[in-house]
């Protein structure tokens, strides 16, 4: 894959796609944590499926992740730090994990500009999609927030509660992803597949049995900005994005 192990890397994954591994998911996590020990390994530990207006409490020590087996095992490992974002937390291991994830309890949207997702583009960050596609690439939500794409967030916030490390409760007002035309906005991110490949922002690689996409965060940001510039809502409103849209990308 051309990775040195010193990168800041966010991995979205499907254990099922990786295939049979001796000792299963723990072996996969061991490999990632060992390889990226001199970098910063990030996994999503989202809770949007089980933290909401009806069930508003997020405790980073105990609230389960809703995005897969590997993420739930990872968040409980020694040395792993979990952010305080009540719906779109990340867990990190390695160099500067606590510092990188600090302040996420101040966010009021899933991927607030200046937050942990956005800063991937500023630190040479990578995103590795293991056995999943861009429909699971939360970073694109972040890009849309930075670009202020309309009709991506609910008008009214939810009132949530984050349990801080000292046990105190912090009230957080969080707007969730929402679009009246498309209840699952990220499903349309796959319309950018060819643009990313053609523009050199994404490389097709393999991990185990899983087909993977290795993304450069800064390049992904630039491609999305370029493609959306003439029609910011096109990912939802158009059935496909014509290649002419990125043919002159530099």
Predicted regions and their residues:
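Short, solvent-exposed amphipathic alpha-helical segments in soluble enzyme
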Residues: 26-28, 143-148
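N-terminal active-site beta-alpha-beta segment that forms phosphate/nucleotide-binding
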Residues: 4-54
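A broadly tuned preference for mixed-charge, low-complexity surface segments
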Residues: 55-69, 94-97, 173-198
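Glycine-rich phosphate/diphosphate-binding loops that line cofactor/substrate pockets in enzymes
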Residues: 1-8, 120-123
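Histidine-centered active-site/metal-ligand motif
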Residues: 12, 141-142
């Amino acid at each position: 894959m051309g990775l040195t192990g010193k990168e800041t890397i966010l991995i979205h994954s499907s254990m099922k796609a990786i295939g049979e591994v001796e000792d299963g998911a723990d072996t996969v996590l061991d490999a990632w944590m060992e390889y990226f020990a001199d970098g910063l390994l990030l996994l999503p530990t989202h809770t949007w499926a089980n933290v909401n207006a009806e069930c508003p409490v997020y405790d980073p020590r105990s609230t389960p992740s809703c995005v897969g087996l590997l993420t739930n095992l990872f968040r409980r490992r020694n040395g792993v730090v979990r952010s305080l974002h009540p719906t779109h937390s990340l867990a990190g291991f390695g160099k500067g994990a606590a510092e990188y994830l600090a302040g996420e309890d101040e966010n009021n949207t899933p991927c607030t500009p200046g937050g942990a997702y956005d800063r991937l583009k500023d630190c040479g960050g990578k995103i590795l999609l293991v056995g999943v596609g861009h429909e699971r690439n939360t970073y694109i939500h972040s890009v849309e927030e930075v670009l202020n794409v309309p009709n991506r967030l609910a008008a009214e916030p939810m009132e949530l509660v984050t349990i801080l490390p000292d046990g105190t409760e912090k009230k957080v007002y969080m707007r969730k992803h929402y679009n009246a035309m498309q209840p699952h906005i990220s499903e349309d991110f796959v319309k950018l597949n060819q643009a990313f490949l053609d523009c050199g922002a994404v490389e097709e690689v393999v991990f185990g049995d899983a087909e993977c996409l290795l993304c450069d965060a800064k390049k992904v940001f630039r491609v999305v900005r370029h493609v959306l510039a003439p029609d910011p809502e096109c990912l939802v409103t158009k059935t496909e994005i014509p290649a002419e849209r990125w043919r002159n990308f530099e």
